[in-house]
A protein has these predicted regions:
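A glycine-rich, Thr/Ser-enriched phosphate-binding loop motif common to dinucleotide/cofactor-binding enzymes
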Residues: 122-133, 206-215, 319-323
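Oxyanion-binding "anion nests"
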Residues: 192-239
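Glycine-rich beta-alpha junction loops
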Residues: 39-41, 129-130, 154-161, 195-203, ...
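Generic solvent-exposed, charged/amphipathic alpha-helical segments
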Residues: 20, 215-219, 260, 264
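Helix-loop-beta segment of a Rossmann-like dinucleotide-binding subdomain
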Residues: 118-125, 194-205, 309-311
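C-terminal active-site/capping subdomain that shapes the small-molecule cofactor and substrate pocket
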Residues: 227-334
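N-terminal Rossmann-like NAD(P) cofactor-binding subdomain of oxidoreductases
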Residues: 1-191, 227-228, 261, 279, ...
Length: 334
């Protein structure tokens, strides 16, 4: 099998580290790994398949000879280096939001729209974490009845805000236990024993940027340009794995049993739906997994053509790193 030179842009961050871990787990054909980060991290090493690999400073020349670049950096870094990556002849699989809504850039969840990889022009975007988890859960239903609208409430883990999120939660819990105060640095308010119903800045009619991603990205991934989504995104004091409560509205009546049968066989999905025996998806059970768990399927009591469901998924893996590497796997199959 052909071996590929793979660069990880943002190799020292949580998603970048997870990408390298998953490359090894999935036996991706890496001939050479090129970890890239800021100048202050250059010269340090990361582990890959038991070997120490030296981190290089991210610069335009670092992409020469690279086949695939996995992006785990912020928007500004992605925008800065994208031209050099494309010029070098590499394919940039980018986890930032910089190019997601660009009509010339595919936005891909491999279980849903793998065919879109064929029209890339050097850049492929990885969707937002909560969007990936949600659309992976509902897309199978769209194959038996067209989804017209969705409402969603997300319960997003602190690690979704970066490595500092879990540290801040732990520090706040400890400070409260000791009767001390702790000034939040990562979140706008105390997250311990609290919920923060705001992720991202205001973007449209009181909706945040994170909330609008569910509609705008969902439309592009599922090829449903008229899809309407109303979403509320909430940060919760959970370390890892996002959860989403979703109401889905179809162009016809869909029974609970129909939905269960379809979801039972859906790629990337595990059905966990047995309320009498207290079997349903929970963040603790879905962490460090590469699939989306779906349960609590029931009729919507307001709209005749609606279903409600609950899904959970690891936002660092399927919501980011694993999805990006699945995209890279599509590239090497071409």
């Amino acid at each position: 099998m052909k071996q590929y030179t793979v660069a990880v842009l943002g190799a020292t961050g949580a998603v970048g580290q997870e990408m390298m871990k998953i490359l090894a787990e999935r036996n991706f054909p890496v001939g050479k790994l090129v970890p890239l980060a800021s100048a202050r991290s250059a010269g340090k090493t990361v582990k890959f398949k038991g070997q120490d690999v030296t981190i290089q400073e991210a610069c335009d020349s670092a992409f020469e000879g690279v086949d695939i670049v996995l992006g785990a950096a912020e928007n500004d870094i992605a925008k800065k280096f994208a031209p050099a990556i494309v010029k070098a002849g590499a394919v940039f699989v980018d986890n930032s939001s910089a190019f997601r809504l660009d009509p010339n850039v595919p936005l891909i969840v491999p279980e849903i729209n793998p065919e879109d990889v064929k029209w890339h022009k050097g850049i492929i975007s990885n969707p937002n974490c909560s969007t990936i988890i949600t659309v992976t859960a509902v897309n199978a239903l769209n194959k038996i009845a067209t989804i017209q609208a969705m409402t969603a409430s997300t319960y997003q883990a602190v690690s979704g805000a970066g490595a500092g999120g879990p540290i801040e939660l732990q520090n706040e819990v400890e400070a409260l236990r000791l009767g001390k105060t702790y000034e939040p640095k990562v979140f706008s308010y105390q997250i311990a024993y609290n919920l923060i119903p705001q992720i991202g800045g205001e973007q449209f009619e009181g909706y945040t940027s994170e909330e609008m991603k569910m509609q705008n990205e969902g439309r592009k991934i599922m090829h449903l340009p008229e899809l309407k989504v109303s979403c509320t995104c909430v940060r919760v004091p959970v370390v890892r794995s996002h959860s989403i409560s979703v109401s889905v509205y179809f162009d016809r009546h869909v029974t609970v049993e129909e939905a269960r049968q379809v979801l039972k066989d859906a790629p990337g999905v595990k059905l966990v739906d047995d309320l009498p025996n207290l079997k349903f998806p929970m963040p603790l059970d879905t962490s460090d997994q590469d699939i989306v768990f779906v349960g609590r399927i029931r009729p919507d009591l307001v709209f005749d053509n609606g279903l409600r469901l609950w899904c959970c998924g690891d936002q660092v893996r399927k919501g980011a790193a694993t999805n990006a590497i699945q995209i890279a796997e599509l590239l090497v199959k071409e």
